[in-house]
Amino acid sequence: MKKRVTGIGGVFFKTKDPDKVKEWYNKHLGFNADDYGCSFWWKDIEGNDAMTQWSPFPENTDYFEPSKKDFMMNFRVENLDELLETLKKEGVQVIDKKESYEYGKFGWIVDLEGNKIELWEPVDQAFKQDEPDDK
């Protein structure tokens, strides 16, 4: 099996007012947030462009369910389907749902403390069309 997790794909958390939170982070920390939050670009060990997403969610979101927590981590993975099968065999709670978009494939698991974890097999190039070339 390839490497399981290759990095942090995103940090997602609930807030009372996502727009105000994005404004605060922009003003005080320089985040350039859009409707989805802020994308941080970096290079992986092979020198490929990679992205990590920071996203505040409304506090009434159901996206983090079945977890009751106010946050969710997203981890970048090399092979989502293979990893989910392996985790299922290891007894990990795998949420029976997968989604695919032009920017990657997603699956979800729940850790031993009830935290929902999003697993993302990214296609970082899909984001580059919207990003300036100076990053």
Label the model's feature ranges.
Residues 51, 86, 120, 129-133:
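Short, charged, solvent-exposed linker or helix-capping segments at domain edges/interfaces
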Residues 1-22, 70-75, 123-135:
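N-terminal beta-strand motif that seeds the catalytic metal site of vicinal oxygen chelate
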Residues 2-6, 12-55, 89:
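Core segments of cupin and vicinal oxygen chelate
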Residues 30-68, 109-112, 116-124:
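Conserved short beta-strand elements that form part of the metal-binding/catalytic scaffold
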Residues 45, 106-107, 129, 133:
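Short Asp/Glu-rich motifs
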Residues 1-2, 61-64, 97:
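Short, flexible, glycine/charge-rich loop motifs used to bind or transfer phosphoryl groups or to couple energy/partner
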Residues 40-41, 102-103, 129:
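Positions that flank functional sites
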Residues 17-19, 67-68, 72-116:
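Vicinal oxygen chelate
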